[in-house]
Amino acid sequence: MSPATILVLAMSMSVDAFAVSVGRGAALGRPRLSEALRTGAVFGAVEAATPLIGWAAGMVASSYLEAIDHWIAFGLLAGVGLHMLVAAFSRRDEEADDTPRGRSIWVLLATALGTSIDAMAVGVSLAFLNVNIVVVALAIGAMSFLMSSGGMLVGRMVGQKFGRLAEVVAGVALCGLGLAILIEHLSA
């Protein structure tokens, strides 16, 4: 696999993480740089690990994963999206969600897992190609780290101007992404 192909693959696998991070940055209002880096680290680690897991599973688990991956992605993304919508509409004022629950590592991890299901499927497909899976996984992880950290900072700027609206849009986008994954797999 050429370096250009690896770069395109890494960017493609990172787009969902970027979009979610923009929404997260907007929802949190004024996330600190350390929080943006933490978000990037979690997304990067999960996005790097899932193609490795998929690759290792290869042919053995592909039929099992293929049968349920869309339900897992839908459940995680829709759950996090609904959580964001409820949080946006339950606030009485325009303050950001700075509560411990809003900054929960578990919410962040669930979101990262939801956006990385496709990377696991890519990992399964890479098992049939002559690629260095470690290089590919590290590229995906590094790109996800950069795009997620940057997305949090972009979301911070958007959130200061649009606050609740940005959180609603992000929640709807997550629910829509989960639904699109489900529909795509059910109609195939």
Swiss-Prot record:
It comes from the Bacteria. Coiled coil: none annotated. It is found in: Cell inner membrane. It is a multi-pass membrane protein. It holds the Pfam family Mntp. Keywords: Cell inner membrane, Cell membrane, Ion transport, Manganese, Membrane, Transmembrane, Transmembrane helix, Transport. The keyword Transport applies. One of its GO terms (molecular function) is manganese ion transmembrane transporter activity. The chain crosses the membrane at residues 3-23, 41-61, 70-90, 104-124, 126-146, 168-188. InterPro entries: Mntp/YtaF (IPR003810), Put_MntP (IPR022929). GO terms for cellular component: plasma membrane. Probably functions as a manganese efflux pump. PANTHER family: MANGANESE EFFLUX PUMP MNTP-RELATED. Belongs to the MntP (TC 9.B.29) family. This is Putative manganese efflux pump MntP. It comes from Xanthobacter autotrophicus (strain ATCC BAA-1158 / Py2). The lineage of its organism: Bacteria, Pseudomonadati, Pseudomonadota, Alphaproteobacteria, Hyphomicrobiales. The gene is mntP.
